[in-house]
Amino acid sequence: MKPKLKAFPLILFFLCLQSITASSQERQTKTISYNNVKVDIVIDKPAGNELNVLMVFHGTVFTDNKIQEAANRTLENFKNILDNKEMMIVSVAYPEENLLMGDNVQQAEAALLWVKNKAATDLGITVKKIFLAGHSQGGYIVTRLNTMHPTDGVIANAPGPLNLVYRCQLEENAKVPASAACTLLRDKYGNTTASPAVYQERSLLNFTSGFKADILFVQGLEDAPIQLYSWPQFKQKILACTDCQKVQFLELKGFKHAALFNSPEAKTAFNQFINSRR
């Protein structure tokens, strides 16, 4: 019996320590509004009141009943690779269902402007630096936001869609399964032959200049052919940019769409990018 009695205080100590750690990390879902645009966000706040903020943006899920799950999962994915545990993470549950590609940038922008201008008052904190990070369509979102508002740095993993003309032509020719992005555009404007400009202006290839903050692009070179088809052109256009802040590319052989979360090299680059701007 004596060993068990001796072990009890130690077990109690670790349980108390666990409780203290959990209470120092607050997680809440909040509906915010900025300029009359509403969007849900998930906030993961560490202890302390002077905080750097990492805003993260999920990939495509198509239906809005999956948005909250995607926002929470994306928060966890980025939290797992983030070395600095003293950053507040804000995951933006931007909508998708029945919206044309890019129309949800307004909700993402509202979240960013809320963090910039209202989070301090609403949460009782001091916001220091603000970073944006996105995966897939979330990478599309943060790249576009980087042409609109200055931040302290942006990370985009496998951003897309890069080229809606190419992608939607494949769908029109039954080469790949139909997607909501192309179907919605076709229903409103006609196909890529009838209205190519509409598809071009919503493609990420159309947003390759005017970056207001340094940006790191991460791309797995075993990603889907649709992504890799336009990747060299996208990279070339950005490298030719004359009014962009510093741009970095990390291309990873042997990694697919989620390279940022699976590659040790990508994780290191992600943290170095953030830490060098603290």
Give the residues covered by each predicted segment.
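Short alpha-helix in the alpha/beta-hydrolase fold that links the catalytic acid
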Residues: 69, 213, 227-238
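Short beta-strand/loop motif that positions the catalytic acidic residue
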Residues: 211, 217-219
